[in-house]
Amino acid sequence: MHLRLLMSTVITATLIVSNNALTSPSDKTKTRALRGASTVGIAADNLLAAHFSPTLKHKESRGDYNNIQTERHRKRRLYDAPHHPEFYDIAVHQVPSDKSYGGGPAIAIFAGVAATFILIDYLIRHFTEN
């Protein structure tokens, strides 16, 4: 029973975290979530980049490298915006995360999490107690 409860909790938490990552206003988080990258994978990529890249050997170089990457990203976004106006509107005019929509979405999210937990618990019980 405890194992079933633990598995249901872990699977439900994973679904919530992945959903939160996909609905997050951060483009970087969405890209990582859609690529299926975990935080372990991102940390490993950063470690490999720091080990093999000559620009990342020292901490001061890392700051310069991040500034260069940020500037490149900013320029790319400026140049790409006129070619894709529909994406430009989405990227620039995002809904602020602190805006309140009332209690409706919170109740719906709670009901969805509870239903997911119950469904996963049922499936685990069904396949393990045969």
Curated annotation (Swiss-Prot):
Short sequence motif named RxLR-dEER, residue ranges: 32-62
Cysteine disulfide partners in this protein: none
Signal peptide from the UniProt entry: 1-21
Induction: Expression is up-regulated at later stages of infection.
Compartment(s) where it occurs, according to its Swiss-Prot or TrEMBL record: Secreted; Host cytoplasm; Host nucleus; Membrane
Keywords: Host cytoplasm, Host nucleus, Membrane, Secreted, Signal, Transmembrane, Transmembrane helix, Virulence
A GO CC annotation given for this chain: extracellular region
Bilayer topology term: Single-pass membrane protein
Residue ranges of the TM segments: 104-124
Superkingdom assignment: Eukaryota
Functional note: Effector that acts as a broad suppressor of cell death to interrupt plant immunity. Inhibits cell death induced by cell death-inducing proteins, including the PAMP elicitor INF1 from P.infestans.
Free-text comment about domains: The RxLR-dEER motif acts to carry the protein into the host cell cytoplasm through binding to cell surface phosphatidylinositol-3-phosphate.
UniProt record similarity statement: Belongs to the RxLR effector family.
Full protein name: Secreted RxLR effector protein 66
